[in-house]
Amino acid sequence: MELPNIMHPVAKLSTALAAALMLSGCMPGEIRPTIGQQMETGDQRFGDLVFRQLAPNVWQHTSYLDMPGFGAVASNGLIVRDGGRVLVVDTAWTDDQTAQILNWIKQEINLPVALAVVTHAHQDKMGGMDALHAAGIATYANALSNQLAPQEGMVAAQHSLTFAANGWVEPATAPNFGPLKVFYPGPGHTSDNITVGIDGTDIAFGGCLIKDSKAKSLGNLGDADTEHYAASARAFGAAFPKASMIVMSHSAPDSRAAITHTARMADKLR
């Protein structure tokens, strides 16, 4: 439902930076919902952001970037309560927005944020690293993401995740991750994209790899591995076979049909 009289303040982006983001990050064309369409009953506005509870201990955070010529572009991540602490998946677009996520956690959950894991080296996932570091939060990313971060204009995470041949994170590199089950499905949207399942729930986060079940395209393929995209999407589905709620970066949560549809679109790239 459109909410024409409700406008979010969103991060501003220069035309030059917008062009760079379209080349190196997620294209606006892959991001279908308007702000009004993204908001649903029960969503909570907090400053520039929107928060949606997905499960008793899981919330989706949504931030917006004002991209000239395209309007407000939404990006989603997760907040997970694990006993007496909080875990975060992905930053917002900017440091200021990421600080708002931390403020919301303080106000609504009032538990310390123990760590954050980011799912690849683009601004929508990694643009708020300085805010996390300023708050003393341990940050983790795929080792390849940390390698790519400087050339993407991003700040690298403090710790690098490595992965076994079967795609699962090496436990020694992901200490105290609790319910976060981190999986590298193979290259797809980017060479470094990782995914996260939430143990004890029916939720799996596909990040920018997975598109919703009504998507018309896979969006920006500038950094994509078109040869392996379909296999990587299917590997994500196989890694989390019991997940019935698929959360992704640029659409509302969907069913497993999102995985099937993404893989079928990617089949056409080969």
Curated annotation (Swiss-Prot):
Keyword check for Nucleotide-binding: no
Positions contributing to Zn(2+) 2 binding: 124, 208, 250
CDD domains assigned: NDM_FIM-like_MBL-B1
Binding site for Zn(2+) 1: 120, 122, 189
Cofactor(s) needed: Zn(2+)
Tree of life domain: Bacteria
Cofactor detail note: Binds 2 Zn(2+) ions per subunit.
Leader sequence segment: 1-28
Keywords annotated in UniProt: Antibiotic resistance, Hydrolase, Metal-binding, Periplasm, Plasmid, Signal, Zinc
Coiled-coil blocks: none
Regulation: Inhibits by captopril, thiorphan, dimercaprol and tiopronin. This enzyme is not susceptible to inactivation by the beta-lactamase-blocking agents clavulanic acid.
Pfam families: Lactamase_B (PF00753)
GO annotation (BP), single: response to antibiotic
Miscellaneous section: Enterobacteriaceae carrying this gene (identified by PCR) have been isolated in Sweden, India, Pakistan, Bangladesh, England, Scotland, Northern Ireland, Australia and the USA. The organisms they were identified in were K.pneumoniae, Enterobacter cloacae, E.coli, Proteus spp, Citrobacter freundii, Morganella morganii, Providencia spp and Klebsille oxytoca. In India most isolates were from community-acquired infections rather than hospital-acquired infections, indicating the gene is widespread in the environment.
Family: Belongs to the metallo-beta-lactamase superfamily. Class-B beta-lactamase family.
Protein name listed in UniProt: Metallo-beta-lactamase type 2
Protein's organism: Klebsiella pneumoniae
Lineage of origin: Bacteria, Pseudomonadati, Pseudomonadota, Gammaproteobacteria, Enterobacterales
Gene name in the database record: blaNDM-1
